[in-house]
Design a protein with these regions (language model features):
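Structural recognition of the conserved hydrophobic beta-strand(s) that form the central parallel beta-sheet
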Residues: 50, 82, 107-113
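The conserved phosphate-sensing helix
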Residues: 176-186
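Conserved AAA+ ATPase "sensor/coupling" helix adjacent to the nucleotide-binding pocket
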Residues: 127, 143-158
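Walker A/P-loop
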Residues: 12-50, 65-68, 98-103
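Loop/turn-to-beta-strand initiation segments
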Residues: 20, 76-80, 103-109, 130
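Short regulatory helix/loop adjacent to the ATP-binding pocket of P-loop NTPases
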Residues: 98-101, 115-129, 146
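Conserved AAA+ ATPase "SRH/arginine-finger" region at the nucleotide-binding site
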Residues: 51-53, 129-143
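Short glycine-rich substrate-engagement loop in P-loop NTPases that contacts/grips substrate
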Residues: 1-7, 45-80, 91
Length: 186
């Protein structure tokens, strides 16, 4: 992303383990969830990942209770909470996060495909440190992702001795419409 370059405030906050709450917004397949997972890994905190379309207030409150025990207990440790599709929660559901954010119990990233200025409560927006916009990936970006997947022996297809034509990768990248998931799933 345009905010992810060496020495940026974004990268320094992750490196220094000071990354606070944020909203990620942009089209599907642009890396919002992947980046949230990488940040959580770097922050070395308990991590909960939920999807707003399948998780209700009851489950959220259970997570926040566990987080409070960690934060107010002996460990004094924050919990990292990632909520995918955050815009799918209504005002009441979004508001159920407020107290935990105010108390500093959780570090929170909400991701959304909707403009957060219209889909996220003002009370939540005022408590997150930053809002980051993700753009559709370029054809070149998608080709790099495809190459990485085809070449990576540990987490990709590198052990399968696959042969591909460069033109085919570019065509696939063009057809994906800037969505890495579509390119990888095709």
């Amino acid at each position: 992303g345009h905010f992810m370059y060496d020495g940026s405030l974004f990268c320094n906050a992750i490196k220094n383990k000071t990354f606070e709450s944020a909203i990620f917004f942009g089209p599907s397949g642009t890396g919002k969830t992947t980046l949230a997972r990488l940040i959580a890994q770097e922050m070395d905190l308990d991590f909960f990942e939920i999807n707003a379309s399948t998780t209700g207030i009851k489950e959220l409150k259970e997570i926040l209770e566990k987080a409070k025990v960690k934060f107010f207990g002996l460990q004094k440790q924050k919990t990292y909470l990632y909520v995918d599709e955050f815009h799918k929660w209504n005002k009441l559901q979004q508001d159920s996060l407020l107290k935990a954010l105010e108390e500093g119990v959780v570090r929170f990233i909400g991701s959304t495909t909707e403009n957060p200025y219209f889909s996220v409560n003002n009370a939540i927006l005022s408590r997150v440190r930053s809002i980051y916009e993700f753009k559709k990936l370029s054809t070149d970006d998608i080709v790099k992702i495809l190459h990485n997947t085809l070449d990576n022996k540990e987490r990709g297809l590198g052990n399968h001795s696959l042969v591909w034509q460069e033109e085919a990768l570019h065509a696939l990248a063009d057809l994906s419409g800037g969505d890495a998931r579509i390119a990888l799933d095709t």
